[in-house]
A protein has these predicted regions:
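An amphipathic, basic-hydrophobic helix/alpha-beta surface used to engage anionic
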Residues: 1-151, 186-193, 199, 206-210
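Von Willebrand factor type A / integrin I
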Residues: 20-27, 34-37, 185, 199-292
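Short, flexible loop segments at the rims of nucleotide/cofactor-binding pockets, characterized by
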Residues: 69, 165-169, 196-197, 245
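Well-ordered alpha-helical segments embedded in enzymatic catalytic cores
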Residues: 116, 174-178, 203
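A glycine-rich phosphate-binding loop feature that marks nucleotide/adenosyl-phosphate handling sites
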Residues: 136-139, 177, 276
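Short, charged loop segments at secondary-structure junctions
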Residues: 143-171
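A glycine- and small/hydrophobic-rich beta-loop-beta segment
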Residues: 160-162, 176-183
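A general structural motif
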Residues: 167-177, 249
């Protein structure tokens, strides 16, 4: 037996795209969106709604929705129907600073944030809203805007594929600049970050308060399951110290969560596996309430 081995140079570039694990939740949320549109078509006008169409009056309709001019013109009673406003501006900011490097289950906090942004972006674009996404730490690392619904997720995957956690804090001035430059009217701002980042940075809290004063702000943070587990392990001195540190972390994050809620910020806190659908549900609730 004889053999021959030879090496050939074959340069190539392979781009690893971030996974869209929460895609399985998209069909059910799209169904909820369609149901919401259907229900709102028979509701009276309210904040966050726009005129949809006219239809014939049926017993049980709210008399306040009667269009008297059209009724006189047609010779029959007709009512106005309304639907949630479309073409709202949704700005999603993914924190790519040092806290995004935290290990969570099979990935990092950054992976969880990117996956959650995929689901929310797909849902919001299907709802007719304008979606803009950026990764931010001390400066903007990625930016996706002006994409149609069918192109958005692919563009996000390509742009976010090269984003890695930056070993520094999320810059409050950079966040303030990003929001002020991209937003001229009321919008929905979603910050995918960590409560740990807020608990130690008063400047960041002040910027979030300013954004929440002008816009609807959602702060989404993934819970690290290991921290909760560490609080129950106290079999020796080392584990006891770890449990004390974990308890301290939970106390600080709970205080940060309460502070953000007092500022009028919607806080979404969930496990890595449930953060994406929880964020999508919060978006649907705000849209139904006309708060976008």
């Amino acid at each position: 037996l004889a053999g021959r081995q030879r090496s050939l140079v074959a340069p190539a570039h392979v781009q690893v795209l971030p996974p869209f694990n929460s895609r399985k939740h998209l069909p059910s949320r799209l169904n909820l969106l369609r149901e919401m549109d259907g229900r709102s078509a028979v509701m009276v006008r309210g904040a966050g709604t726009e005129f949809d169409s006219l239809r014939q009056y049926v017993p049980g309709d709210d008399v306040r929705s009667i269009d008297w001019r059209s009724t006189a013109r047609r010779g029959e009673v007709v009512v106005r129907t309304w639907r949630p406003e479309r073409d709202r501006h949704v700005l999603i900011i993914i924190d790519s600073a040092r806290h995004s490097a935290t290990r969570m289950e099979e990935g990092t906090r950054l992976d969880v944030g990117i996956d959650s942004s995929f689901l929310l972006s797909a849902l919001a674009s299907a709802a007719g809203d304008r979606v803009e996404v950026m990764a931010l730490d001390t400066r903007r690392r990625a930016w996706i805007a002006g994409k149609k619904s069918g192109e958005l997720i692919a563009a996000m995957a390509n742009e976010l594929a090269d984003v890695e956690p930056y070993l520094g804090e999320l810059s409050a001035p950079a966040l303030n600049l990003a929001a002020s430059q991209r937003l001229s009217q009321h919008a929905l701002v979603v910050l995918l970050s960590s409560l740990e980042a807020v608990s130690h940075d008063q400047a960041l809290t002040d910027v979030l308060a300013m954004i929440a004063h002008k816009h609807t702000l959602i702060f989404a943070s993934a819970i690290n399951p290991q921290i909760e587990q560490m609080t129950h392990e106290r079999d020796n001195a080392d584990l006891a110290y770890q449990a004390a540190a974990a308890e301290r972390t939970l106390l600080e994050t709970n205080q940060a969560c309460s502070q953000l809620k007092r500022l009028g910020i919607e806080v979404v806190e969930a496990t890595p596996a449930t953060l994406a659908p929880a964020l999508a549900d919060t978006y649907l609730a705000l849209k139904a309430a006309g708060r976008l």
